[in-house]
């Protein structure tokens, strides 16, 4: 499995609009096991996006999907900047099957 955790900082006062734009644009994304958008309770303009994919290749391929490209274009004016970004190797959890290591 392949994971990503990233911080986005919305333009001042645009966090909820950014969240609506992102969530409204989520469509069928082959290989996406989990995609969660969360508000940062300590910063009124920050959101965190946590993704779990079956592989890095599925994530890269998703960026070429028309619905994803359209969502990115609609979200760009609402984003002030990007904060931290981390790649992870999810081992499992609620809603995600545990990875079996061989």
Q: Where are each of the predicted segments found?
A:
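Short, well-ordered beta-strand segments in beta-rich or mixed alpha/beta enzyme
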Residues: 2-8, 36-63
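Non-catalytic surface loops within mature trypsin-like serine protease
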Residues: 10-12, 55, 89-92
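An amphipathic, aromatic/His-enriched active-site/gating alpha helix that lines ligand/cofactor pockets
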Residues: 24-33, 52-87
